[in-house]
Swiss-Prot record:
Component of the gamma-tubulin ring complex (gTuRC) which mediates microtubule nucleation. The gTuRC regulates the minus-end nucleation of alpha-beta tubulin heterodimers that grow into microtubule protafilaments, a critical step in centrosome duplication and spindle formation. It is linked to Microcephaly and chorioretinopathy, autosomal recessive, 1: A syndrome characterized by microcephaly, cognitive impairment, underdeveloped retina and choroid, and epilepsy in some patients. The more anterior parts of the retina, near the periphery and pars plana, have a grayish hue and diminutive vasculature similar to retinopathy of prematurity. Visual impairment becomes evident during the first year of life. It comes from Homo sapiens (Human). GO terms for molecular function: gamma-tubulin binding; microtubule binding. This is Gamma-tubulin complex component 6. Belongs to the TUBGCP family. Component of the gamma-tubulin ring complex (gTuRC) consisting of TUBGCP2, TUBGCP3, TUBGCP4, TUBGCP5 and TUBGCP6 and gamma-tubulin TUBG1 or TUBG2. TUBGCP2, TUBGCP3, TUBGCP4, TUBGCP5 and TUBGCP6 assemble in a 5:5:2:1:1 stoichiometry; each is associated with a gamma-tubulin, thereby arranging 14 gamma-tubulins in a helical manner. Gamma-tubulin at the first position is blocked by TUBGCP3 at the last position, allowing 13 protafilaments to grow into a microtubule. Residues 810-889, 929-951, 1000-1023, 1271-1412 are annotated as: Disordered. Residues 1321-1335 have a biased composition (Low complexity). GO terms for biological process: cytoplasmic microtubule organization; meiotic cell cycle; microtubule nucleation; mitotic cell cycle; spindle assembly. The gene is TUBGCP6. The keyword Cytoplasm applies. It comes from the Eukaryota.
Length: 1819
């Protein structure tokens, strides 16, 4: 057996745990632990060994009672510092003794047992003494202070001292450890191996700086409050401060932690001692730390750097439970029993899941109990599952309990009510609760379908959204989180019912339109609206009122429904409230009144017109309900449209509308006017005929009488003249004889004098002449003698010179003479011969520039020798040329007339001597011209032998050869002209400045001749000498600016010389040439040189070019052109490059389009856009009648980039060509409208609108066409220009015979994919290349382009991959374009082409079948060639309804997400979609408001038509205006005169105001009226308001007791009410007063006139004054009468008529009429506010009546005295007048103020009338 020591060692080893560390614990020192265990073991051993001695020492304890023993143990506890435990023990003992069961003996025994067991437990180590006062062994009191060096304090501070020493050791290596810790390997250098060193106070700097410092003694626990201020304990004054000299290492900088110390509580030592803490902060180092690249075993498989540590829960459920228990124990220890934590109840998770699922549907369980007063579920405290804390489980379960509470409350809220007589909440609330119940049923289904195998967290997550909805619905229904029936502190508002409930739900849906509650609210709103929409449906469609609970908008008063006047309309059906929100929901607020009026109107129509079509119509009505489904919405809109259409059709057949009635009346009125005009014209014509016949008869009589008088006068005049002549002859015969004798004598004398004078003159002149002759002869002899030698010398030289000349002529036949001499003649020839119909445009009057004729190199490449140019300055205005060299002899006998063309029948000149001279001149010119082509002269001779040669003055003395030379070697020479020839030619030509393009074409030699011998009206097209490029208007490479255009003419074989612009030059502001009648166009026809850059060039207008060439182009090759006006090529049989109005390769902008015509086979020349250019903003062309279109028909260049192009409209193309394209080759086209496919039997390249090999997207399909003739583009065209922003010329394709090989859309040199596709041509294409109908491509096919949004046509190579095929948009329709052009027949060329290919129909069918069969293969090839990234067709997630996203209000459903096309979306899904896409107001408007508005408009229109058409409402208004407003002047005048005459006769009221008198007065007035025979006149009657006793004298309202009544029947009395008639009567009464005033003044006038006639009152002063008084009063009354007539009868009536034209329902008619009457009363000053003004007017009226009575009451006095007759009452009348004047001026002031203040602006009319001449203003 081992020794005791060995056994104790083994025991300690067995008890010691394994050597491992845990989180938050220090590493165990095994030696120290083993030592402590041994100490315990030995103590136990020694205690038992010396037990006897200890028992002897102890007193006898058994005799003491158990209570005393327990108190002794309590004292021991107090001594040990466990005071609370001692107190607790004493309390328990006292409670036990005080218990009722205390006398039991067992209690004492049990206490004894407990006392005996008191020390038998394991020894408990007392906690370290942290508090000196708490663990003091002096029980119950505190001992006096004994200094810092006492025992207790030293024991208390032992651990502090150890920590301080350790701190001093750590400070030395702190810097190195801090710097090395970041880069060290994991786990090295740390104070403990544990990861969380909670127990190590040295591991944290905060711990060192606070708890370990001097103030650590003052810190009771870790504090987090920043406002804590630590202070020293109270120390007595006599305390020993020696202990304060402890060296405490100062470690905290005072600025680092201001919350725990400040300068006030720092000791001097800690302030002054320098800090030894290193400056390097570990946290700063951690922030700036960069992860090491080192890898170690802890980081295998992890990237270097920081890694998240695992969560505590990852250690497992048991570890988490232990950790929770540990912390709960710590909390209980710290709280000391104050914190009573609930006892944890561990429940299995499966049971808890069952309880959770139960409580979600309101089922009580052990975990969830229901609090009945609060109707809320309560979670049992302490419930938890393994692996989760009770708090987390409680928070999760409390949420679930809240969901259950909401469910329970909503279930109680939505219980089906008992429908008895006490129920008053209405149908809307029932529908709402039913919708709520349905939602709760779906919720229960969700809960019950949840599998119980899910975890708590999963269930909580799954039901979070439903729980939120339940909570929201509970709050919506008023049964939310707060207790039911209370809202905060006050009572909760009652839940709305009826209409207010719908408004409440609608507003809530609007507020929640963007969250998850929106669909639930929409569902509840839809369900709740069902009863209301049913009520609205019945009320609006049929007028039926069904409201069992009185919750809707209308209340019925049955007693008023039996009335037949306005009360039926106003009181039969009444709105329940004046507030609109109380009557209708918010979403129908804007049509609430319309709904109300619509039902009333239908009931009125049923009552008044039971056979009305609205009452018996069987047209099905559209339903009214809240709808969120797209399909149903579309169906409702369709139903509304169908319903409205059918009802309008029924209305048209069964009734006449107001508009139709007005139209019929207008038509009848116009017909009446026409008949009246015809009758008037007939009468007028008869009158005019009669007048004309009378006038003619009278005129004949007058002429006859005049003729007789004239004859008599002539005879008498002749007789008198004869008598006078005889007298004159007798008187003057003797005088004549005397005058003749004197005249003869005088003439004889003058003759004698003249002869004498002439004899003297002759004598002296003869003498002087002889003297002069003698003198001259003498002088001549002297001079002859002097010059004899010189004369002889001169004669010899002259003879010698003549001999030399003769010799030279005989030897040399062609003398060298520069062409300048001959050229100088040309500008003078400005008038062409008769064969030039275009005028002399070849000879421009401006300055021209001449060039030396070095042109042989053009036609003869081998002779291209550079020659120096001799430019000649040309004078302006045809002055002739100043030659650079000296003058050469030119024979006088050679005139310019020899060069002029001879007429067709002219005889040859007989002067034989002139012929050699002309020959010499022509030979001289011909030296500088190139030789003609071989075979040209014979052809000329053989073709036109009878026609003499003509001279074309557009060139220099060039004979016109109307021949057709066969193509010979010259063609080869021309075609071989390459770039080297061009370069040599440019070198030889140089550059010159041009002043006029006319002379440029005129003065340059050119060959071969290009003018055909054409007479007027005749043209002989001949064959073309192809390929001549010899004609250029300017030297190649020239630079020309501002050159006027030439107009080349009649050139059979054009030359380079015909071009007015040099090749390669840069031209600006050049007006283009207009080439004409070019049978075989050449490069010479081009008005633009090759390679030049041109801007601002006006286009040429080429004409009649049978074979167009490059020369027809008005744009230079390769130039840069802007602002080019287009050409208009015409009648080109074989179009060529020359027909193009845009330069090849140019940059063109802003080009206006051309309109080419009749091109059978167009060429490249027909293109109005350069090849390869980039064109934008193009106006489209409209090509026409192109049988075989060509590249020239294209309105888009090859390789260009086009945007914003309007589509072309190609027509009738049997064999389409490239010319029909609307898209350029190689372009990038966007937004191009589709091309209309045409009747193309054999499709061509042009039929495709998609490039070869291009990627195409968004292509609108056109009709496929099939092409059997596929041309290969020839290789002679050159591409490669870029022209931005060009408006291209889009020519009309020109007529050209088929088979022109130069008709190309592409070239070999172009960068195109057609060349690559060449080998892939089908086999059948080969033979078709030579067929006559194979044009070169008519299509909109761009080579190498990238096209998007292009309207494609069918591919033109059926089997070629790289093209794209689309289906047809429609049969020949493109957009809204419609081809209105006639179907022109095919021309003869097409007929011959059709005849030459007999199997054309079979070929077409075969090619069609082949093309259809090749489409699929083509598409497959295309799909294989392009692998496009496509949208996914369907995903599983995409087949579900989409989650609402941010663009929900914006994106339509079609663009939101792609869904599986096989999934047919149900109505509910579309409802979800539509609620996402459309806002709620829009949905309500389209589902409810739309059918309501449609039917309401129908009903209102029917009611308005019924009243206006059937009841003739407007005729009643007019009758009221005619009679009661006195618009009928005859009626008003007659009525007033009859009444006032009886009144003025002094009749009493009884005599005047009886029915017989009044009826006779009225009937007489109606007989005088214009409208007395109308049926509405029978409604008039005169009635008495009251019977006055007497008529008041001078009272203007003497007849106010009388009124004119107008009877209005049902149902018109709804609109024309009694109140309206009374207002009419008020206006009538005032108008009657005006009539009384007029009658009184008329009576005054009558009396004054009668008195003046009887008493001769002309000289009376008073009479004159009374006339003036009467006149002023009459003016005033007439002003008021005119004002009333204008404002009431005209202005107000016109406004009323305009308003009636726009009324929509009966209410509007009623309002319009009431407003009309109100305006009439207001403008008539009959309102209460205008009473003061009316009082003034009444006073003035009484003064007028008073004036009358004063005048007629007494007779005038006798006319005695100087003042004439006088009236006795004149003073009274003058006083009345003065008062009248005062009142009228006062009225003027009052009215002026009213107008100025803007109160009654209509009174401006009154002011203008009364003060027209400023009478009142001046006064």
């Amino acid at each position: 057996m081992a020794s005791i020591t060995q056994l104790f060692d083994d025991l300690c080893e067995a008890l010691l745990p394994a050597a491992k560390t845990h989180l938050g614990q220090r590493s165990v020192n095994r030696k120290r632990a083993k030592r402590s265990l041994k100490k315990v073991a030995y103590n136990a051993l020694f205690t038992n060994l010396f037990q006897d001695e200890t028992q002897q020492l102890q007193p006898d304890m058994s005799k003491l009672p158990a209570r005393n023993k327990i108190l002794m143990l309590s004292f021991d506890l107090r001594v040990g510092g466990l005071g609370p435990k001692a107190d607790r023990l004493e309390e328990l003992v006292e409670e036990l003794e005080a218990a009722p069961c205390c006398p039991l003996l067992e209690v004492g025994s049990v206490l004894d047992l407990l006392v005996q067991l008191a020390g038998s437990g394991p020894p408990q180590v007392l906690p370290r003494k942290r508090d000196y006062f708490l663990n003091n062994k002096h029980v119950g009191r505190n001992v006096p202070y004994s200094g810092y060096d006492c025992d207790d304090l030293s024991v208390f501070e032992m651990d502090v001292q150890s920590l301080i020493s350790r701190e001093e050791c750590l400070c030395h290596s702190m810097i190195q450890e801090t710097l090395q810790v970041m880069e060290a390997a994991p786990g090295t250098g740390l104070p403990t191996v544990g990861l969380f060193s909670f127990g190590d106070p040295c591991g944290d700097r905060f711990e060192r700086d606070t708890r370990v410092s001097l103030f650590g003694a003052l810190v009771h626990s870790r504090t987090y409050d920043m406002d804590v201020r630590l202070g020293l304990p109270p120390v007595p004054d006599n305390a020993d401060l020696s202990g304060l000299a402890i060296k405490v290492p100062p470690s905290v900088d005072q600025w680092e932690d201001e919350g725990f110390q400040s300068a006030s509580n720092l000791t001097p030592d800690s302030q002054s001692e320098p800090s030894v803490t290193p400056d390097v902060d570990l946290w700063e180092a951690a922030l700036t730390y960069e992860a090491s690249k080192r890898r170690c075993w802890e980081r295998v498989g992890c990237p270097p750097g920081h890694r998240e540590e695992p969560y505590l829960t990852e250690a497992g459920r048991d570890a988490f439970d232990k950790f929770c228990r540990l912390h709960q124990g710590e909390l209980q220890l710290l709280a000391g029993g104050v914190l009573q934590a609930p006892q944890p109840v561990l429940v299995k998770e499966c049971e808890l899941v069952k309880d959770v699922l139960n409580v979600l549907i309101g089922v009580v369980s052990a975990t969830f109990s229901l609090c009945q007063p609060a109707q809320a579920f309560v979670v049992k405290r302490g419930v938890h599952v393994s692996g989760a804390s009770p708090e987390s489980i409680s928070s999760l379960l409390s949420e679930v309990a809240e969901y259950g509470t909401c469910y329970t409350r909503l279930s109680h809220f939505s219980l089906q009510p008992v429908l008895d007589s006490l129920y008053s909440k209405g149908l809307v609330f029932q529908a709402f609760t039913s919708g709520l119940r349905r939602y709760l049923q779906y919720y229960r289904a969700c809960v019950l379908s949840t599998p119980p195998t899910l975890s708590l967290l999963t269930i909580g997550f799954l039901f979070k959204k439903l729980g939120r909805q339940l909570r929201y619905l509970a709050e919506l229904c008023g049964v939310g989180a707060v207790l039911p029936g209370t809202c905060g502190g006050g009572p909760r508002a009652a839940f709305p019912t009826g209409v207010k409930l719908l408004s409440y739900l609608y507003q809530e849906a609007l507020h929640n339109c963007s969250n998850e509650h929106y669909p639930v609210l929409l569902s509840l709103l839809k369900t709740s609206c069902e009863p209301y929409t049913r009520f609205i449906h019945d009320w609006v469609y049929s007028g039926v009122f069904r409201d069992a609970y009185g919750e809707f908008m209308i209340q019925v008063n049955h007693e008023y429904l039996s009335f037949r006047d306005k009360l039926y309309w106003t009181h039969g059906y009444v709105l329940i409230s004046k507030e609109v929100e109380d009557c209708v929901p918010v979403f129908l607020k804007h049509i609430a009144h319309d709904i109300y009026v619509c039902g009333k109107t239908i009931n009125l129509l049923k009552l008044c017109c039971p056979r009305h079509y609205l009452c018996w119509s069987d047209v099905p009505v559209p339903r009214i309900s809240v709808i969120f489904s797209l399909e149903e919405l579309k169906e409702i809109e369709k139903d509304c449209a169908v319903y409205v259409g059918r009802m309008e059709r029924v209305a048209r057949h069964s009734s006449v509308s107001k508009e139709e009635k007005e139209l019929r009346m207008e038509i009848a009125k116009q017909e009446l006017i026409a008949h009246a005009r015809e009758a008037a014209s007939r009468v007028l014509s008869a009158l005019s005929d009669r007048q004309m016949s009378e006038r003619m008869a009278l005129d004949a009589r007058k002429r006859e009488q005049f003729q007789r008088l004239k004859e008599q006068f002539v005879k008498d005049q002749e007789r008198r003249q004869a008598a006078r002549q005889e007298e004159l002859d007798d008187d003057f015969s003797y005088a004549r004889e005397l005058r003749d004798r004197e005249r003869r004598l005088k003439s004889l004398e003058e003759e004698l004098e003249r002869k004498a004078r002439q004899a003297l003159v002759d004598h002296y002149s003869k003498l002087s002449a002889e003297a002069a002759r003698r003198e001259q002869k003498a002088l001549w002899r002297i001079q002859r003698h002097r010059l004899e030698s010189a004369r002889l010398r001169f004669l010899l030289e002259d003879e010698k010179h003549i001999q030399e000349m003769l010799k030279a002529v005989s030897e040399a036949h062609q003398p060298q003479e520069p062409p300048d001499v001959l050229l100088s003649v040309h500008p003078q020839v400005t008038s062409p011969g008769p064969e030039h119909p275009e005028g002399g445009q070849g000879c421009d009057s401006g300055s021209a520039e001449q060039h030396s004729p070095a042109w042989d190199g053009w036609n003869r490449p081998g002779l291209l020798t550079p020659q120096p140019l001799k430019p000649l300055a040309v004078g302006a205005g045809g002055r002739g040329l100043q030659q650079a060299e000296g003058a050469r002899p030119f024979s006088d006998s050679l005139s310019i007339g020899d060069f002029l063309p001879v007429g067709p029948g002219a005889e040859p000149s007989v002067q034989t001597g002139m012929v050699p001279l002309l020959e010499v001149a022509l030979q001289t010119i011909n030296l500088d011209l190139p030789p003609s082509a071989p075979g040209e002269a014979p052809a000329a001779a053989s073709t036109q032998p009878s026609r003499p040669q003509e001279y074309d003055f557009s060139t220099v003395l060039r004979p016109a050869v109307a021949t057709s030379p066969a193509p010979g070697p010259l063609q080869a020479a021309e075609c071989s002209l390459g770039s080297s020839g061009l370069q040599l030619w440019e070198d030889s030509c140089g550059k010159m400045d041009a002043c006029g393009s006319a002379s440029r074409e005129t003065l340059l030699p050119s060959h071969p001749p290009r003018r055909a011998a054409l007479e007027e009206g005749s043209s002989q097209p001949t064959e073309r000498l192809f390929g001549q490029v010899s004609g250029g208007g300017l030297p190649t490479g020239d630079y020309a600016s501002e050159i006027a255009p030439t107009r080349p003419r009649w050139n059979t074989h054009g030359h380079v010389s015909d071009a007015s612009i040099r090749v390669g030059e840069n031209v600006s502001d050049v007006a283009p040439t207009q080439p004409r009648w070019n049978t075989h166009g050449h490069v010479s026809n081009a008005s633009i040189s090759l390679g030049e850059s041109v801007s601002d060039v006006a286009p040429t207008r080429p004409r009649w070019n049978i074979h167009g060439h490059v020369s027809n182009a008005s744009i230079r090759v390769g130039e840069n052109v802007s602002d080019v006006a287009p050409t208009r090529p015409r009648w080109n049989t074989h179009g060529h490059v020359s027909n193009a109005s845009i330069r090849v390769g140019e940059n063109v902008s802003d080009v206006a389009p051309t309109r080419p015509r009749w091109n059978t086979h167009g060429h490249v020349s027909d293109a109005s856009i350069s090849l390869g250019e980039s064109v934008s903003d193009m106006a489209p062309a409209r090509p026409r009648w192109n049988t075989h279109g060509h590249v020239s028909d294209a309105s888009i260049s090859l390789g260009e980039s086009v945007s914003d192009m309007a589509p072309t409209r190609p027509r009738w193309n049997t064999h389409g060509h490239v010319s029909d394209t609307s898209i350029r080759v190689g372009e990038n086209v966007s937004d191009v409208a589709p091309i209309r496919s045409r009747c193309n039997t054999h499709g061509h390249v042009s039929d495709a609108s998609i490039s070869l090999g291009e990627p195409v997207s968004d292509v609108v399909s056109t009709r496929p066409r099939w092409n059997t003739h596929v041309p290969i583009p020839p290789p002679h065209m050159v591409l490669g220009a870029l022209s931005p922003e060009a408006e291209p010329n889009t020519p009309r394709p020109q007529q050209s015979p088929p088979g022109h090989t130069s008709q190309s859309a592409l070239s070999l040199g172009a960068q195109s994919t057609v060349l690559d596709c060449g080998p892939r041509l089908p086999v059948e294409v080969g033979p078709s290349l030579s067929s006559p109908s194979s044009g070169c491509g008519e299509g909109s096919i761009s080579v190498g382009e990238n096209v998007s949004d292009v309207a494609p046509t069918q591919p033109w190579w059926p089997n070629t991959p790289g093209d794209s095929v689309s289906e047809e948009l429609g049969p020949g329709r493109s957009g809204d374009t419609e081809d209105l052009s006639p179907n022109w027949p095919l021309n003869s060329q097409e007929d011959t082409a059709a005849q030459s290919s007999p199997g054309r129909g079979e070929e077409a069918e075969a090619s069609a079948a082949e093309a259809q069969g090749g489409e699929q293969a083509y598409l497959a090839g295309l799909a294989g060639q392009y692998h496009l990234e496509r949208y996914p067709d369907s995903y599983e997630s995409m087949s579900e309804p989409p989650i609402a996203h941010l663009l929900r209000p914006v994106l339509p459903r079609a663009f939101a997400f792609p869904v599986d096309p096989q999934v047919q979306s149900a109505a509910d899904e579309t409802a979800v979609q539509l609620s996402e896409l459309l806002t709620l107001p829009v949905l309500m408007k389209r589902s409810i408001t739309a059918p309501l508005a449609a039917h309401i408009s129908l009903v209102n229109k029917a009611a308005v038509d019924y009243f206006f058409v059937e009841l003739h409402l407007e005729a009643h208004y007019e009758a009221l205006r005619h009679f009661l407003l006195m618009e009928d002047g005859e009626f008003a005048q007659s009525l007033s005169d009859l009444l006032f005459e009886k009144l003025g006769a002094g009749q009493t009221p009884g005599e005047l105001l009886n029915p017989l008198v009044l009826n006779s007065v009225l009937s007489k007035a109606l007989q005088c009226s214009l409208h007395g025979d109308t049926p509405h006149a029978s409604n008039l009657s005169l009635a008495l308001k009251y019977l006055p006793e007497v008529f008041a004298p001078n009272a203007p309202d003497v007849l106010s007791c009388l009124e004119l009544r107008y009877k209005v029947d049902w149902p018109l009395n709804i609109v024309i009410t009694e109140g309206c008639v009374s207002k009419y009567s008020g206006v009538f009464s005032f108008l009657l007063q005006l009539k009384l005033m007029m009658w009184a003044l008329k009576d005054v006038c009558f009396h004054l006139k009668r008195t003046a006639l009887l008493s001769h009152m002309a000289g009376s002063v008073q009479f004159r004054q009374l006339q003036l008084f009467k006149h002023e009063m009459q003016h005033f009354v007439k002003v008021i009468q005119g004002y009333i007539a204008n404002q009431i009868l005209h202005v107000t009536w016109c406004e009323f008529r305009a308003r009636l034209a726009t009324v929509g329902d009966l209410e509007e008619i009623q309002r319009a009429h009431a407003e009309y009457l109100h305006k009439a009363v207001f403008r008539g000053l009959l309102t209460e506010k205008a009473a003061p003004v009316m009082n003034v007017i009444h006073s003035i009226f009484s003064l007028v009546l008073k004036f009358r009575s004063q005048l007629i009451s007494q007779a005038w006095g006798p006319p005695g005295g100087p003042r004439g007759a006088e009236h006795p009452n004149f003073a009274l009348m003058q006083q009345s007048y003065n008062t009248f004047k005062y009142y009228s001026h006062f009225l003027f002031k009052v009215v002026t103020k009213l107008v100025n203040r803007g109160y009654q602006p209509h009174l401006e009319d009154f002011l203008l009338r009364i003060n027209f001449n400023n009478y009142y203003q001046d006064a």
